[in-house]
């Protein structure tokens, strides 16, 4: 079976399924990837046959709402050229798997019309019921709904072109247009619960300090520290938390760029803006107790989860972070926001705790209660890991994805 993956940052969400196919000597696995990610992909997956492309520059004078669409069309054209070059060499595929978010899947069917296309749908935008308009501190303008219609254009094209699709969670599936949901399966990428597991002897070292499992450590993780992941709620809650729990240490993992939403009002990012706000209010963060460690290598990041007594995960109604599931797999007691993506996984009082996203007082009191009663939280930790093992383990998710791929390959050969 020959499978082609298309993703500008290969392996991305396809890492584990690509690895499984590469390990199967009966499979030939190819990928089209952005040039910036090609070197890393070669190291991670040496058996992968790579075709890289350089993303073209955006054109000047494009309507601002169309800037992303313009870039996606241009990227789609470059990928189509790469596909045509493969086709001209008589290289064909049983299935093509693509992420449409950057436009790369836009013209796949024009080059390989009879090859089944399996598309990964990460998020379909809407002006109601999800991230947009959720946070009153950062209101959206009256043109927001119109901009989102334009932003969804490539996703609608992908939904129309694909033979089948998959998306990680039921909530993300529910955001898709009703008429397309029947061809999209719910299959998560999966969590390596053998690598991410509880370790009562775990130690995390940072700038001469040693943090150990069993200590009163509160952790927070996001790719980037921004409102979409509740950094404004968390940092503003810290002065009260540090006062209520004098013995705790706080570890914050994440960068200062913006992954989602609007740019920060401070040139150094949202964290700098919030830190300055707290200092001006007379409640500066104690650098001896709050440790912002930036982005970490994966092994170090796992150590942070393993030493955590309480892990805080806050998110707008948006794509669920891998970090929340990995925190649960590591046996952390997760206190999450009572937003739909989190509620799909965590049931308050059964495998974690939930608080209103905006309620800082509830967040503080729930953290303090968890720290004061560690024995009570033990059952929640065990149930959290069991949830991830039962529903999101690689051993379950990768075979489910391979089943989708093989079913489409079978349709082509039948």
Predicted regions and their residues:
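Conserved donor-binding/catalytic core segment of Leloir-type glycosyltransferases
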Residues: 207-229, 235-240, 250-251
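Aromatic "clamp/platform" in nucleotide-sugar-dependent glycosyltransferases that forms part
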Residues: 316
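Short hydrophobic beta-strand element within catalytic cores of glycosyltransferases
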Residues: 333-336, 346
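Conserved acidic donor-binding segment of nucleotide-sugar-dependent glycosyltransferases
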Residues: 348-349, 353-360, 369-375
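Nucleotide-activated donor-binding/catalytic signature segment of Leloir-type glycosyltransferases, i.e.
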Residues: 258, 262-295, 299
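N-terminal subdomain of nucleotide-sugar transferases
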Residues: 1-51
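Acceptor-binding helix/loop patch of EC 2.4 sugar-transfer enzymes
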Residues: 57-66, 115-153, 194, 198-199, ...
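A short, well-ordered alpha-helix in the C-terminal region of glycosyltransferases
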Residues: 362, 369, 376-391, 397-403
